[in-house]
Amino acid sequence: MNNQPCSIVWRRFLTSKVKPAVRIPNENLKANKPTNFTKNFPLNERTKAWERAGEDKESWFKRKYAHVHAKQKSQPQVDLYGKKEAHYSRLKQDILSSKRQQEEHKSKYSRKSVTLGLRPNPLMEYIYGTNSVIAALN
């Protein structure tokens, strides 16, 4: 019986301390030292080719790669399998066929006269006399 109250007191002592949700590793070691960023920088850097040549970057690249564009311009475009030509001919053919379809579609609905669709309305003639729209179009 004496043992039970002692264990309750001991349990309360352990649970009364608020524990942090996240534990930071090596917290005691990092707390006192200042942060040092120099360790993140590279110790030695590779010297660039233009620095070795003693030129600025732009002139070095111009000197090195100037001939590439001239060489590409002098060589004719080579289409070994004729894909480009086939593509352009297919595009031209598609455009012509779409124009032909459009003309066929238009020809179905073309009317010889505008007044063919308008029929005389007897009610309109009774109220207004001759149909004014048909009279104006004729």
Curated annotation (Swiss-Prot):
<keyword id="KW-0808">Transferase</keyword>
<comment type="similarity">
    <text>Belongs to the class IV-like SAM-binding methyltransferase superfamily. RNA methyltransferase TrmH family.</text>
</comment>
<comment type="function">
    <text>S-adenosyl-L-methionine-dependent 2'-O-ribose methyltransferase that catalyzes the formation of the 2'-O-methylguanosine corresponding to position 2270 in S.cerevisiae 21S mitochondrial large ribosomal RNA, a universally conserved modification in the peptidyl transferase domain of the 21S rRNA.</text>
</comment>
<keyword id="KW-0698">rRNA processing</keyword>
<keyword id="KW-0949">S-adenosyl-L-methionine</keyword>
<dbReference type="GO" id="GO:0032259">
    <property type="term" value="P:methylation"/>
</dbReference>
<keyword id="KW-0489">Methyltransferase</keyword>
<protein>
    <recommendedName>
        <fullName>rRNA methyltransferase 1, mitochondrial</fullName>
        <ecNumber>2.1.1.-</ecNumber>
    </recommendedName>
</protein>
<feature type="region of interest" description="Disordered">
    <location>
        <begin position="92"/>
        <end position="113"/>
    </location>
</feature>
<feature type="transit peptide" description="Mitochondrion">
    <location>
        <begin position="1"/>
        <end position="21"/>
    </location>
</feature>
<keyword id="KW-0496">Mitochondrion</keyword>
<keyword id="KW-0809">Transit peptide</keyword>
<dbReference type="GO" id="GO:0005739">
    <property type="term" value="C:mitochondrion"/>
</dbReference>
<dbReference type="GO" id="GO:0008168">
    <property type="term" value="F:methyltransferase activity"/>
</dbReference>
<dbReference type="GO" id="GO:0006364">
    <property type="term" value="P:rRNA processing"/>
</dbReference>
